[in-house]
A protein has these predicted regions:
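Conserved loop-to-helix interface motifs that mediate assembly, gating, or partner/ligand docking
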Residues: 2-167
Length: 167
């Protein structure tokens, strides 16, 4: 049977853990609120962009470019987003589960024909562990996304598609 001192230490430990958990909950709540505000501020731009694109696409119905042509899939690329931390394990687990389900559809191509752009440390670690080809290290984008690096990734993917390296 534990002594009185051990019981008091255990109670103090549980209380300390409760305080830490409460602080983490407040930080997560603050980050969630900030993300919600950012999304709400972006919605008017998204609807205007959608309107512009629909108008453009309706007026150019016969427009053809290299990205609209259909071709046999021999090489495939995935852009996969995850977090850099473990504080959202369900999110990361679901992302990785979906990635693995999607890759399953293309296993007949072989690992050498699957290229993954891992954005976030958790997915980058999983890609490396499973032995798939990674297009680079984009872990910093998960914490601090920026337009310049996103454009670089889009250009890389576009160039690889045009050059026939991915389908």
């Amino acid at each position: 049977m534990p002594s009185l001192k051990e019981i008091k230490n255990r109670i103090a430990s549980v209380n300390s853990t409760r305080k830490i958990t409460s602080a983490m909950k407040m930080v997560a709540s603050s980050k969630l609120h900030h993300a919600q505000v950012m999304i709400e501020n972006m919605l008017p731009y998204e609807s205007m962009l959608e309107h512009i694109l629909k108008t453009f696409l309706a007026s150019e119905a016969d427009a053809q470019n290299v990205f609209t042509e259909e071709r046999e899939v021999k090489n495939i690329a995935f852009v996969v987003y995850s977090s850099n931390s473990s504080l959202c394990g369900g999110f990361n687990a679901n992302i990785i589960k979906l990635l693995l389900q999607t890759i399953e559809e293309y296993t007949h191509l072989g690992k050498d024909h699957i290229l993954i752009y891992p954005i976030g440390r958790k997915v980058a670690e999983k890609v490396e562990k499973l032995g798939y080809r990674s297009a680079g290290d984009f872990t910093n984008l998960a914490d601090k996304p920026n337009v310049a690096e996103c454009i670089d990734i889009a250009r890389q993917i576009g160039k690889k598609f045009i050059d026939g390296e991915i389908d």
